[in-house]
Amino acid sequence: MPKGIPLTEEEIDRRRHEIFHSSVALILKQGFANTSMQEIAEAAGVGKSTLYDYFPTKDHVLLFVFEEELDILQGQAEDIAAQDIPVEEKLLKILEAQLEYLLNNKNFFTELSMQVMQLGQTGQQRIMKKRYAYQDLLRGVLEQGGREGVFRPVNTRLAARAMIETMEVLVYTTRPTGTPREMLGDVLDMFMHGIKS
């Protein structure tokens, strides 16, 4: 960790966030693979050796960035899940928040997702833990709906995964049938009512 006066965990975390925020534009412009640690250090206004104090490797930068993005999504979903509103509205709001996030961060999320696949096993496991937490939260909403008799009994783990993956399809499809928000309405109608007449 940084030399000299010892920093608290809070100060270290704040500095990591500052480095992250100052390097986002650079990563978006050049791509993560084409951005060097020297360039990240320059964008953050720190020396390369100082950068290594906070992030020992470029993979650590990537992991931190991706975990931060997943934490934002998770935090939004947790806030919605805690609201005292009908479970159908809760589900819709969570999916709308995910869709909005993906639309607002489309290029950045695409770049991060491609690079994360190159991480080692430990990094992959950390990312999967975050993804599973989001899936489990959505699964909890579906199970709440089941207990309340709003949703019929289904494989909630599979349903949650399908809904999450569908949000990405709505953003990245090359054959849209409407705006992403319009397609979300269509997809939710299919999820809620099926396709059988």
Where are these regions (language model features)?
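Amphipathic alpha-helical packing segments from all-alpha helical-bundle domains
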Residues: 71-78, 122-148, 157-161, 172
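Basic, helix-initiating cap at the start of DNA-binding domains
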Residues: 1-30, 35-43, 60
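C-terminal peripheral helix-coil segments that are non-catalytic and often amphipathic
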Residues: 1-3, 100, 136, 140-148, ...
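Amphipathic alpha-helical segments used for helix-helix packing
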Residues: 102-122
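Short hydrophobic/aromatic patch on the recognition helix
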Residues: 45-55
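Hydrophobic alpha-helical connector segments
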Residues: 64, 78-104, 159-163, 184
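Amphipathic, non-transmembrane alpha-helical scaffold segments
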Residues: 12, 16, 20, 62, ...
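Amphipathic alpha-helical segments enriched in hydrophobic/aromatic and basic residues
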Residues: 8, 27, 32, 36-37, ...
